[in-house]
UniProtKB/Swiss-Prot annotation:
It is found in: Nucleus; Cytoplasm. One of its GO terms (cellular component) is nucleus. InterPro entries: RWD_dom, RWDD3, UBQ-conjugating_enzyme/RWD. The keyword Glycoprotein does not apply. The gene is rwdd3. Residues 7-113 form the RWD domain. This is RWD domain-containing protein 3. The keyword Isomerase does not apply. Enhancer of SUMO conjugation. Increases SUMO conjugation to proteins by promoting the: binding of E1 and E2 enzymes, thioester linkage between SUMO and ube2i/ubc9 and transfer of SUMO to specific target proteins which include hif1a, pias, nfkbia, nr3c1 and top1. Has no effect on ubiquitination. GO terms for biological process: positive regulation of hypoxia-inducible factor-1alpha signaling pathway; positive regulation of protein sumoylation. Its main location: nucleus. Keywords: Cytoplasm, Nucleus. The RWD domain is required for the sumoylation enhancement activity.
Amino acid sequence: MSKEAFDELSVLSAIYCEQGEFEVLEESPEKGVVFRVHTLIDNNEKTPLDIIFHISPEYPNTPPDISISSNHLSRRQCHDLRRSLLDTAQSLPAEPMVHGLMLWLQENFSDLIKTSSCHSAEVRPETTEETWTALLHLDHMRSKAKYIKLIEKWTLELRLTGRLFTGKLILILLQGTKENIKQYIHLLKSVKVDVDSSGKRCKEKMMSVLCEIPKPEDKIMMTTFEVKDILSLDDLRREFDLIGLNELYHQFVSSLT
């Protein structure tokens, strides 16, 4: 960790000093630092946000990766907040920026939420339907950019959250209603999503459903769908740990390696 990053973490831990406000989740010379900030945003009422920052060893020359979740916001709103923070981070000079991003979010939160709400009628998915978790394994992606674009489009339309992990293993982790997950799997099998070895468009014929189960009540619901380019199996395991699904990893993923 650079001295700049270390100094910034010290400042952040001093600012967010109440219990549960600041937590370092992971730290290594190779991967950098992953930490969580829990904050309350004043917007007529207090909105709790959990923001996870991943600062790489190249930080601040490389902006942090960011995840946002909140029980008071919809998946679309969390997605839009994350996108706005990432865009802002890209526009800033190469210097410590996390505290500045937190201040920017506080100042612009109301406008960002209004804009997001205009794009989507939902404010918070109020549903009594049971939330399910599904884990899919893909053999390959030849037309990766187009494939990912379709995956993101369908998860947004079907109000599914989760992760797409690309790398040695290609996994799609989904959370949502059972009906919407079934519809997603149907789309994946019936629409031409990739190309074959000759470059001709083709349907997904080598996808396997590793599991499709009700989400345990004690597990946190993911509020966004994010694409993660995972270079190592250790990184993949840590990603499952971060979202509280390490049991899922050990039960269904470790046997694939």
